[in-house]
Amino acid sequence: MTISVAVSGASGYAGGEVLRLLAGHPNVTIGAITAHSNAGSRLGELQPHLHGLASRILEDTTVENLSGHDVVFLALPHGASAEIAAQLPEGTVVIDAGADHRLQDAAAWERFYGSAHAGTWPYGLPELPGQREALKGATRIAVPGCYPTSALLALTPGFANNLLLTDDVVIVSASGTSGAGKAAKVNLIGAEVMGSMSPYGVGGGHRHTPEIEQGLSNAAGEPVTVSFTPTLVPMSRGILTTATAKVGHGVSYAELRQAWADAYDDEPFVHLLPEGQWPTTKSVQGSNHAVMQLAFDAHTGRVIVTCAIDNLTKGTAGGAVQSMNIALGLDETAGLNLQGVAP
């Protein structure tokens, strides 16, 4: 089975990562490669690491250029995907790597994004309860945010098994600078980032907060309240999330560990590490893998889960390709058999 794929937003980090993975996919032929302000440029000028595609010329991001493909990846800023997606044929598999179709609550979308809600699509995180089935045959898929990917993988087993309390969840995530996109910003230049760490979106202001609460609430079957703080760290890619929650009365460490093991032992890309080994972002760099470890703080009655992912791969493009594979009935791991990079 060979499928034709178009990729929009190909000059950015997310679009470039989608192309990197698709270039090694055994079932994919890459069709239109589009950008907006960079239309007419050689891809190799903007994505010099994509050697096999370097001579391709970027087309303008229009419905006409994206139509006629089996699959369309939209790696566009929030607010830009919905208008294009609405005009693409219903039978085309459209995978939105932006935020436009993730949230179920229209009021939450309007509060955090300041525009009209475009609707909700099946959520592209197959490891969540029920999501793999929801993605089979889907023609519209919303790729999760990078922070929610790590946070939901970290805590969902506890909430899905009624082991955690819902009103005291604290999540702190450290991210590399590529999570902020490719546009030039003063706070992201080398002189500002090197040798420094800084929080942002503090006090519940980050747009991924309602997405994290949504996913954990779905797992728990009741509302979950989350305090989320992201931190910018001096590396190009990767996320290390530390997520903590109060455990229910009488819940033991053995019960916690068993719940996480049961959730992920058979997953191809999510791994609970052996006791005593802790996640590092370097170990998953460039791969679709997530690694995690958990501990139980008996003094405070909290579980602490750390989870490392590559924000551009498992946190964006890898999750998108994995979801495409499931939707089309392909091998779920096709194009994603990449290990981490060391040193």
Swiss-Prot record:
GO biological process: L-arginine biosynthetic process
Catalytic residues in the record: C146
Presence of the UniProt keyword NADP in the record: yes
Location in or out of the cell: Cytoplasm
Catalyses which reaction(s): N-acetyl-L-glutamate 5-semialdehyde + phosphate + NADP(+) = N-acetyl-L-glutamyl 5-phosphate + NADPH + H(+)
Function: Catalyzes the NADPH-dependent reduction of N-acetyl-5-glutamyl phosphate to yield N-acetyl-L-glutamate 5-semialdehyde.
Protein name from the UniProt record: N-acetyl-gamma-glutamyl-phosphate reductase
Species per Swiss-Prot/TrEMBL record: Paenarthrobacter aurescens (strain TC1)
Taxonomic lineage from the root: Bacteria, Bacillati, Actinomycetota, Actinomycetes, Micrococcales
Underlying gene: argC
